[in-house]
Amino acid sequence: MSLRSLTLALALLLSVLCPASLCAQEGAVERQPYLDLRRYYIGFRLGLHLPDVRITNSGAVNSLGGQLWADSPVWHPGFSIGVIGGVTLVPQLELRLLPTLHLGDVPVAYTDGSQEVERLSLRTSCLQLPLELKWAALRWGNYRPFVAAGGYAALQLGARSSELLYLLPIDYGLSIGAGCDLYFSFFKLSPQLTFHYGLANLLQTHRPDLQGDPRIRFTEAVRGMATRALLFTLSFE
């Protein structure tokens, strides 16, 4: 499934959930009417994410006289868990810090132009530290839609320097998302869809440790790698 079709599917899910909740609010008693007047708040979130890498092929001719092209052919869903710390700046505008652990991997397939010749598993587990602004609409009963945007830094976990595709440990990028707050008697549930776009080239291209190894052709075939991910979370506050 492509990123576009998956994004549309999740966006459709949000659009179904939110209007359904909205329609149910007419005449409903507001639950926790003072919840959003808090100056500070905490919470946690659970979710699934689809990690991916944007690959820049070098087009280099390898020692066998051919060329290789790398791509990420399929999606492998990963698991995400994190905590939430927020401060209300003004009514409807919040600043949130969202330390999150993402566990997952990305398959990278190499072709010679006619067939696949190799497939590697690229570890993309990371500890991510997003900082985002959340702007919410006026509350309608027990429902409130919102949008969020910000940036993040991330520490890659589990990568080994001996791997053919070795990712540098520090990543950073931008994020944008949307969701809705659903108010219940004892907590607030917030489904959210977020897109992360990495800005750093994480690939370690200088690999003297692989000199003399025939597999270095898989490393030299790639000039750059940057991350991106689609994240669906359920936040509890």
Label each PLM-derived region with a short phrase.
Residues 55-61, 107-115, 157-165, 202-210:
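Outer-membrane beta-barrel translocator domains and adjoining extracellular loop/strand segments
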Residues 51-52, 58-116, 231:
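Glycine- and aromatic-enriched membrane insertion/assembly motifs of diderm outer-membrane
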Residues 29-31, 66-71, 114-121, 160-166, ...:
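Extracellular loop and loop/strand-boundary signature of outer-membrane beta-barrel proteins
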Residues 38-40, 75-79, 123-129, 143, ...:
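Residues that define the transmembrane beta-barrel architecture of outer-membrane proteins
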Residues 92-95, 141, 186-189:
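Repeated loop/turn-to-beta-strand initiation elements of outer-membrane beta-barrel proteins
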Residues 44-48, 79-89, 99-101, 129-135, ...:
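Residues on the lipid-exposed face of transmembrane beta-strands in outer-membrane beta-barrel proteins
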Residues 24-78, 235-237:
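Short glycine/proline- and aromatic-enriched beta-strand/turn motifs that initiate or cap beta-hairpins
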Residues 29, 169, 183-237:
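Predominantly the C-terminal beta-signal and adjacent terminal strand-loop region
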